[in-house]
Amino acid sequence: MVLNHLGLDISKTDMCDYLEKGSVGHTDPKEKFIGDPTDSNSYGCYSPVIVKAANKYLESKSSEYKAKDISGKKLDDLFSYIDDGKPVMVWGTVDCKDGSYTVSWTVNGKTVKWYSPEHCMVLVGYDDNNVWVADPMHGDVRSYKKSTFSDRYDKLGKQAVIIEK
């Protein structure tokens, strides 16, 4: 969605070809997408995987844009990017539902806990009480109460990605 916003013509399914993929129980979501992104039963991935895939695509098109991981910022700190016309990819939950850790596994001696229903969206607007996100799963823009969305964003590790020159 963000790449299309910047005038780059790529579909969600074509973008999936740029993702590194791994399997449940053997993969760290910070390193690879867990499962097959075209399968609704797959898990997902976190910001470093998206940055790597986006940059791989951008380099293949000789684009001057670069994906940048800006994770760790409070939700309110992302609004300056929106003010500058830069949509921000953010992690939260499907339909802003409350979530929980549903499964865990060990990769290279480190425990990976999966928070579900994890979902990546694009933050496109805000006001004092609400945020608006472009949701690739639904294909539209949705509004959520800012405090609830901030809670979900925090629970997913305050992950955020921008694409800029």
Predicted features by range, described:
Residues 76-77, 98-100:
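Short acidic/glycine-rich loop or secondary-structure boundary segments that cap or lie
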Residues 1-86, 165:
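Cysteine-nucleophile protease catalytic domains, especially the papain-like/related folds used
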Residues 89-91:
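Structural motif
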